[in-house]
């Protein structure tokens, strides 16, 4: 429920660089934080999609604040890396008495109009040579997580719905030959083609 980082920590979700989406709730949490910050489903979907699609990182907790990965006043930073375990243990001890997990969030995903905007952005970037075809495939899978792709109407979702959407997108991408090739290239130190 709280994050403790070293002052030089780099925070971000970079999985799209090898053709998959973040697993384990990364897309859900990013969307949730953008939605809470803006109160607007379209903005939250667009910011989450751009951030995860480009694999944006904050080179420090301060920079990660702009990406909603670090929450000042809630999360903490230590200057000395050697103090991480000691401070984390103290945080846990302080949180433990009377601890209850947060209520599972409910979120609203925007309708498919924003999906069309995302698709047009990727098509334009592909035509200009900014992206490879599989970048578009990966980006549009991220979009399926944060947009109601079946209707123009907003869609209320639970945390579990978001986990299910993430898992489905991850598995679809993991089965593609392009993602397999990108992962193999990364593991062997070769350039991603």
Describe each model-derived feature in a short phrase:
Residues 1, 5-40:
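CoA-thioester-processing core
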Residues 1-3, 7, 60-69:
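Active-site-proximal glycine-rich helix-loop-beta segment
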Residues 7, 74-75:
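Residue-level detector of family-conserved "landmark" positions at structurally sensitive sites
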Residues 20, 71-74:
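Hydrophobic transmembrane alpha-helices
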Residues 32-56, 60, 66, 72, ...:
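Intrinsically disordered, low-complexity segments enriched in small/flexible residues
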């Amino acid at each position: 429920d709280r994050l403790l980082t070293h002052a030089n920590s780099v925070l971000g979700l970079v999985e799209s660089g090898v053709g998959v989406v973040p697993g384990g709730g990364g897309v859900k949490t990013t969307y949730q934080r953008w939605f809470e910050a803006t109160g607007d489903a379209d903005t939250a979907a667009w910011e989450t999609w751009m951030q995860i699609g480009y694999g944006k990182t904050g080179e420090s907790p301060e920079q990660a604040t702009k990406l909603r990965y670090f929450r000042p006043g809630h999360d903490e930073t230590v200057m000395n890396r050697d103090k991480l375990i000691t401070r984390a243990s103290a945080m846990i001890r302080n949180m433990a008495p009377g601890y209850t997990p947060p209520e599972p969030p409910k979120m609203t995903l925007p309708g498919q109009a924003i999906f069309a905007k995302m698709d047009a952005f990727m098509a334009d970037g592909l035509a200009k040579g900014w992206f490879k075809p599989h970048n578009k495939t990966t980006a549009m899978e991220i979009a399926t997580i944060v947009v109601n792709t079946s209707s123009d109407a907003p869609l209320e979702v639970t945390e579990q719905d978001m986990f299910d959407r993430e898992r489905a997108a991850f598995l679809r991408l993991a089965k593609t030959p392009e993602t397999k090739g990108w992962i193999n290239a990364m593991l062997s130190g070769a350039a991603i083609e």
